[in-house]
Swiss-Prot record:
Family: Belongs to the MCD family. Mastoparan subfamily.
Top-level taxonomic group: Eukaryota
Tissue expression pattern: Expressed by the venom gland.
Name the record gives this protein: Mastoparan-VT3
Stated role: The synthetic peptide shows antimicrobial activities against Gram-negative bacteria (but not against all strains tested), Gram-positive bacteria (all strains tested) and the fungi C.albicans and C.parapsilosis. Exhibits moderate hemolytic activity (25% at 100 ug/ml) against washed human erythrocytes.
Principal place of residence: secreted
Any single Gene Ontology cellular-component annotation: extracellular region
An example Gene Ontology biological process: killing of cells of another organism
Subcellular location per the Swiss-Prot or TrEMBL entry: Secreted
Disulfide bonds, paired cysteine numbers: none
Membrane-spanning intervals of the chain: none
AXPX repeat boundaries on the chain: 27-30, 31-34, 35-38, 41-44
UniProt propeptide residues: 28-45
């Protein structure tokens, strides 16, 4: 059961990362893709560190 939850959580985080980066790419299409994320490009970009911290807090 714990493995299933871990797999689903990992897939959820991967999807959030994919859609977050897609939104950032749409917001700043001229950005260098190898330069890394630009926090100024999309103010509503998903904060993965906050999501990870919340998940650790909830799952223990």
């Amino acid at each position: 059961m714990k493995n299933t939850i871990l797999i689903l959580f990992t897939a959820f985080i991967a999807l959030l990362g994919f859609f977050g980066m897609s939104a950032e790419a749409l917001a700043d299409p001229k950005a260098d893709p190898l330069a890394g994320p630009n926090p100024d490009a999309d103010p509503e970009a998903i904060n993965l560190k906050a999501i990870t911290a919340l998940a650790k807090k909830l799952l223990g």
